[in-house]
Amino acid sequence: MDSSGYNSRMANRRSPTTAADPALLGRVKGLVRQVLGGTPADVYLFGSWARGTQRPTSDIDIAIESAAPLPRALLASLREALEESTIPNRVDVVDLAETDAAFRDRVRREGILWIASGSA
């Protein structure tokens, strides 16, 4: 390492943050549970937060899967609650019923089942 710390700083810039903040994710999960209430749906955490490669400014990606598309009012309420919360990261919400099969398969394969149907 050089005396200026340059090499260390550059390594930190390239390296993803690997430890997900459990308190932050817990707040997101709690808000999702609250808004979904008894809606029968599976909720997946996917993307960089699920892989553990997120950075401090990375958005949090969640996907909701139910037998039928979720009511637009419910999705709007969830998005609004997340935007108005004190959660510092943007949270992207995807209704899997509105996506193509390849995307759904990727979320199911690579994502983490965060909330199981009926436990919201």
Identify the role of each PLM range.
Residues 61-63:
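Short, well-ordered beta-strand segments
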